[in-house]
């Protein structure tokens, strides 16, 4: 049993089936990727895990507890944090203030310790800690979104398309950060369209197509599947 166990998860939008019979396991300390083409159901799966959507059937167990259909605020209290595709920063608040919001449930001492850790992990944020989030570049804003999610010290961090819309050099920065978080023992489940980079960083990955899991394995195993890239991922 992993820190997150999803069994036969299905989600529908009215009569449209978006996710069908999806089963995923995330072990503690693992970096797990969820890859596939647009419309595969990756973001919908992540939304159901985080409590943003209620599944039609199947189960979600987080830290050994049944959390199927639990709301996002409860998932946060249980130790799950989400970095959404659209970063949703408080644009008029400074970098530091955004971090404080992320650590709202921690004590003052814990918040300051975590801010210090965030600045160690994201040096660019320390130099811009008084800057309003709305004035950050895309790469800086993505780093702030990740840092803010880490302020709750989650046992599982979910990321939805963390490299989306970033220049190639910034994509490298994001994946170097993901690799570092993995080396530090963080547990991550990441939805990502950049399949090659995700598989290089992942301990394990799942490939989705048309709402279903069509392949799974270690990152290295899936990188060797040329047929998989051509048929399911589109040669990314």
Model-derived features with residue positions:
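Helix-to-loop junction immediately C-terminal to a conserved catalytic motif
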Residues: 50
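ABC ATPase C-loop
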Residues: 149-150
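ABC-type ATPase nucleotide-binding domains, specifically the catalytic core motifs of the NBD
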Residues: 14, 70, 95-113, 121-123, ...
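The feature captures the beta-strand-to-loop junction immediately N-terminal to the Walker
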Residues: 35-37
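Conserved ABC transporter NBD signature motif
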Residues: 58-66, 78, 111-113, 117
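Conserved ABC ATPase signature
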Residues: 132-136, 140
């Amino acid at each position: 049993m992993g820190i997150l166990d999803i069994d036969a998860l299905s989600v529908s939008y009215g009569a449209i089936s978006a996710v069908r019979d999806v089963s995923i396991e995330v072990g503690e300390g693992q970096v797990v990727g969820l890859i596939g083409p647009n419309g595969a159901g990756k973001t919908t799966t992540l939304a159901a895990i985080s409590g943003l959507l209620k599944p039609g059937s199947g189960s979600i167990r987080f830290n050994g507890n049944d959390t199927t259909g639990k709301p996002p605020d409860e998932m946060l209290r249980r130790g799950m944090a989400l970095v959404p595709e659209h970063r949703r920063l408080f644009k008029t608040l400074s970098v530091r203030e955004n971090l404080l919001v992320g650590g709202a449930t921690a004590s003052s001492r814990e918040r300051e310790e975590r801010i210090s850790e965030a600045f160690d992990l994201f040096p660019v944020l320390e130099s811009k800690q008084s800057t309003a989030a709305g004035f950050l570049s895309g790469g800086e804003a993505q780093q702030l979104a990740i840092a803010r999610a880490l302020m709750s010290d989650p046992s599982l961090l979910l990321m939805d398309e963390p490299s989306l819309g970033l220049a190639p050099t910034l994509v490298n920065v994001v994946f170097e950060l993901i690799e570092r978080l993995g080396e530090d023992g963080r547990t991550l489940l990441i939805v990502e369209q950049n399949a090659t980079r995700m598989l290089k960083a992942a301990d394990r990955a799942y490939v989705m197509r048309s709402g279903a899991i069509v392949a799974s394995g270690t990152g290295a195993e899936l990188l060797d599947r040329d047929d998989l890239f051509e048929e399911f991922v589109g040669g990314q």
